Amino acid sequence: MNLRIILTVAALLAGTGAATANCYEGLGCDDSQYFTTQALQQGTCQQLWEVRNMIYQQNGYCFQTNRAKQSFSNDGCYINDQASVRLNVYERKNVATIQSVEKAKGCK
């Protein structure tokens, strides 16, 4: 799974201001397909963090941490409270599954 290349392309596209889903080889599209635990386990902690935060970015979240601000642009963001970000059913489940895998892997 070449998630790094796909993430790079998705990050470039996210900067265009278009609210579009990110699709990942081996995972699917984050707003219309459920990611499987098995597929997510193939990713590194960094990749999991990036995929999870791409979901929040495409839904208008303004990142608060220095790490996230350096990795994602806050241009065009409009929601400061992560709990207020409106995610659809697929996105909510995918975030939860990613967080579960991150926890199992001991990601920080």
What are these model-derived regions, one by one?
Residues 39-73, 77-78:
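Amphipathic alpha-helical packing elements
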Residues 63-108:
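Compact alpha-helical subdomains of small soluble proteins
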Residues 8-12:
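Hydrophobic helical h-region of N-terminal Sec-dependent signal peptides
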Residues 1-7:
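Bacterial N-terminal signal peptides that target proteins for export
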Residues 15-18:
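N-terminal signal peptide c-region/cleavage motif recognized by signal peptidases
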Residues 27-37, 77-82:
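Acidic/histidine-rich, surface-exposed loop or edge segments in extracytoplasmic proteins
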